[in-house]
Amino acid sequence: MAEPFKNMYNEQFFDLFTKDLKLVIDDFDAHGFVSQVMDDEWEGRELKQRCIHITTILKKFLPADYKEAIAKILELLDHVKSTRPDFSVIDDTKFGLMLEYGAILDNYVEQYGLDDYETSVKAIEKITQFTSCEFVTHPFIIKYPDKMMKQMLVWSKHEHWGVRRLASEGCRPRLPWAMACLLYTSPS
């Protein structure tokens, strides 16, 4: 039987993730982070629940100010891209070698960034170049329908294929694991 996808979040992953976080957050407490993430309920959580839990714990270890936290997240992406290009490069044949990081980082924007449109849109644009952020866009489309649909149009012409893909996939009304986004209903 195949290994459950949720098990990609394991000790090996957290060892790498926390080492990377320590490089961008001077006082990052890797042991404290991992012990809070891998709590007594860890094994019972499914993939999406694990992502949300990791993100919730990560918030405690990032700067309290959302803009500063996003700056650290983007710094983390830059670090990974510059030190492990094989790990961070995606193309149209292999989408998301950074899936494990991306699912956490885009979830951070979804959970905590809805009230800071500008910072979040810039973060989404950058993160989606490493992994898909299509699940993140629905709450923003619902809260900021006109602004976000204009942004989708801008992204549809972006130089990076992942951002262009987000412009298409991110405004689909129904996506697995994403909240429904039914702004426009068919008259039929």
Predicted region positions:
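Surface-facing alpha-helical segments and adjacent helix-coil boundary elements at the starts of domains
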Residues: M1-S186
